Amino acid sequence: MNVLICDDSGFARKQLARALPADWKVDLHYAANGLEGIEQVLMGHGDLIFLDLTMPEMDGYGVLETLQREGLRNKGIVVSGDIQPEAYQRVMGLGALDFIKKPAAPETLLALLKQHGFWSAEPGNTAATAAAPTSGIVADAGVKITPEIRDVYQELANVSMGQAADLLARLLNAFVVLPIPNVNVLEVSELHMALSAAADSDTLSAVCQGFIGAGIAGEALILFHDSSFKDLAKLMNHQGTLDRTAELELLMDTANVLIGAFLRGYANQLDTPFSQGHPVVLGQHRPINELINTNKSRWRRTLAIEINYRIQDYAVQCDLLLLFTEDSIATMNNKIMHML
């Protein structure tokens, strides 16, 4: 049988391949996005597809829609960082066989394969694999981020982002549209440019919360677009006047959900618990340049993870930035080396 792992993260592809039963007699194939996945399917390489949802070119929903539209009988199991209830309902409605969250545990995959009749133990069986794309990596104690290391950071952020979105979706009873996280090492001037680019609205409200744990430290920053407050109040069933005090309460509630859930997910994957400081309001209804100038002394060279959250069918948008100190990068790189 031909099994296809379709995910834009090379790290996630390798992680999933390692989690499959060692005695499963299959040929493994790989695709880095939905279009490549469809090409592999048409080549006969996807009797069973393990499918990520958030990908460039064509996402997992697009793959399932294409399979359904073309009448292709390939079976798809979604393995996703986006674990919102609506994401589950959408993929099952598009004909997915099953849905599990990232990272997929070996015991979960084994139970799933048994449940759907894809696996039975046979003495001497080994998986015949087409090796996942990889390249030699040498640990670097400095701040260098290789493409392979960046890919791991992006996948860790993808899983954490999905967990935070799931909590927010349940709180608001709405669907959160998720992007592919941006990961970069930024100088101070570049960080200012990134903050300006992230904020495409006239004025913002911002909350910052510090965190620290075992050689890793940084700040989580929420940039909330002021045009979002009206719809956010509606989603949270806010009663009464929407004044600055009410907006601050909505802002803090949203920040607590997104920052707290993201940091828990990230810390769990690095096996490093974080202690979180008290959230600090950096400003309300202020232009991004004013926020940057007022707080520029806070930020130095940093590893930045940027995620834009949007609520489908509502004018609600905010940016979450995780800013890790330069000293933290070497510690995290070393932890990641043990995951590769």
Language-model segments: residues:
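Alpha4 helix (beta4-alpha4-beta5 surface) of REC/receiver domains from two-component response regulators
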Residues: 62, 83-98, 111, 121
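Composition-driven recognition of glycine/serine/threonine/acidic- and proline-rich low-complexity segments
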Residues: 87, 122, 127-147, 151-246, ...
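Active-site beta3 strand of CheY-like receiver
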Residues: 44-50
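Active-site residues of response regulator receiver
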Residues: 52, 80
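A Lys-centered signature of the CheY-like receiver
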Residues: 102
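Helix N-cap/capping motif at the beta->alpha junctions
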Residues: 30-39, 59-63
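Receiver (REC) domain active-site loop signature in two-component systems and cognate sites
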Residues: 55
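Two-component/phosphorelay signaling modules centered on CheY-like receiver
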Residues: 10-29, 69
